[in-house]
């Protein structure tokens, strides 16, 4: 089982501001804010519409401070996969509530989502009725294949980038936009900021020498990465 210190690091330590998480996950900051804090919309001539928070965030009086623990950014990472599959986020809440009930309180950051989540969600769709809003949400995420229900390819690709600890909860996330640079978010290294997985060096730490005119080879030798990894990292940052 994961130790108490690691659990605290993943759940209780604020590592990311919303702006940082927005950059790392390639999600609009405003979208992350609604996931972290919920929202209230007041359309003209209609009742107010409220949405509750759907990722783990720690309170802070100003938005410029770190608010997301690692488990929160892991949940947001999976939500972003759902979003990229084309699922309307304003309709996802009933499906998430069903996942939490059947998988656990941090279902989006759980390995059980990868192994059982598609079947769990499909049962929810069947209960909701064919053609219902919840059924359409689930069908946006899941497809039948060889007699089983599996997540669509884009969702599966995101889930495959997550590593899990012995407690079945996320412990590391590979950021796919960095390509072969193999850059990860790991709360145990670099205070959770993007690091090269092989060397543990923060991506931010290699930028200074490169911007100062050092060659790719010199920086690669100094920091234990390859020139190609540096180029991939720079391309991801510039995108």
Curated annotation (Swiss-Prot):
It comes from the Bacteria. Keywords: Toxin-antitoxin system. Possibly the antitoxin component of a type II toxin-antitoxin (TA) system. Its cognate toxin is VapC45. This is Putative antitoxin VapB45. It comes from Mycobacterium tuberculosis (strain ATCC 25618 / H37Rv). Pfam families: DUF433 (PF04255), HTH_66 (PF21321). InterPro entries: DUF433, Homeodomain-like_sf, VapB45-like, VapB45-like_HTH, WH-like_DNA-bd_sf. Disulfide bonds: none annotated.
């Amino acid at each position: 089982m994961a130790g108490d210190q690691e659990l605290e690091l993943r759940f209780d330590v604020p590592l990311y501001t919303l702006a940082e998480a927005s950059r790392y996950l390639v999600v609009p900051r405003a979208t992350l804010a609604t996931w972290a804090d919920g929202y209230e919309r007041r359309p003209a001539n209609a009742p107010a519409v409220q949405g509750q928070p759907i990722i783990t965030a720690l309170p802070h009086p100003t938005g410029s401070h770190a608010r997301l623990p690692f488990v929160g950014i892991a949940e947001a990472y999976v939500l972003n996969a759902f979003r990229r599959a084309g699922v309307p986020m304003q309709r996802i809440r009933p499906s998430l509530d069903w996942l939490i009930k059947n998988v656990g309180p941090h279902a989006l950051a759980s390995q059980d989502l990868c192994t059982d989540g598609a079947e769990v969600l499909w049962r929810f769709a069947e209960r909701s009725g064919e053609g219902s809003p919840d059924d359409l949400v689930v069908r946006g995420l899941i497809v039948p294949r060889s007699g089983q229900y599996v997540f669509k390819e884009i969702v599966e690709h995101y889930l495959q980038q997550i590593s899990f600890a012995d407690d079945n909860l996320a412990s590391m996330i590979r950021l796919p936009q960095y390509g072969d640079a193999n850059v990860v978010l790991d709360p145990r290294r670099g205070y959770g900021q993007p690091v090269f997985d092989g060397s543990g060096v923060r991506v931010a730490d290699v930028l200074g020498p490169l911007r100062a005119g050092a060659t790719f080879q010199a920086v690669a030798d100094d920091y234990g990465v390859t020139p190609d990894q540096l180029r991939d990292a720079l391309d991801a940052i510039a995108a």
